[in-house]
Amino acid sequence: MNLKPLADRVIVKPAPAEEKTKGGLFIPDTGKEKPQYGEVVAVGPGKVADNGQLLDMQVTVGKKVLYGKYSGTEVNVEGEDYLIMRESDIFAILD
């Protein structure tokens, strides 16, 4: 991937959607819910504060994160799906 996010943006590779229910039934594509977690694959340099100071990013590449259902912008690069979102759209880091 050759994407480099700007400012306080983060690129996330969403986790794959569930294929089956707990009971073993296959879920059709129209019934699948989008996952709300994924892995950070790139981060921008940070946000510039009003006083001109660069604020460091709190997330780093490789971290698993939890984000909102409608967070980010979906993009497809080289056949792979990604989300580009602001760091503030991330709710938590999963350990």
From Swiss-Prot:
Gene (name only): groES
Family designation: Belongs to the GroES chaperonin family.
A molecular function (GO) term: ATP binding
InterPro entries the UniProt entry points to: Chaperonin_GroES (IPR020818), Chaperonin_GroES_sf (IPR037124), Chaprnonin_Cpn10_CS (IPR018369), GroES-like_sf (IPR011032)
Organism: Chlorobium limicola (strain DSM 245 / NBRC 103803 / 6330)
Any one GO CC term of the record: cytoplasm
Protein's cellular compartments: Cytoplasm
SMART domains given in the database record: Cpn10 (SM00883)
UniProt keyword terms in alphabetical order: Chaperone, Cytoplasm
Protein purpose: Together with the chaperonin GroEL, plays an essential role in assisting protein folding. The GroEL-GroES system forms a nano-cage that allows encapsulation of the non-native substrate proteins and provides a physical environment optimized to promote and accelerate protein folding. GroES binds to the apical surface of the GroEL ring, thereby capping the opening of the GroEL channel.
Stored PANTHER family: 10 KDA HEAT SHOCK PROTEIN (PTHR10772), CO-CHAPERONIN GROES (PTHR10772:SF58)
GO biological process: one example: chaperone cofactor-dependent protein refolding
Subunit structure of this chain's protein: Heptamer of 7 subunits arranged in a ring. Interacts with the chaperonin GroEL.
Pfam families to which the protein is assigned, alphabetical: Cpn10
Gene3D superfamilies in the record: GroES chaperonin
Protein name: Co-chaperonin GroES
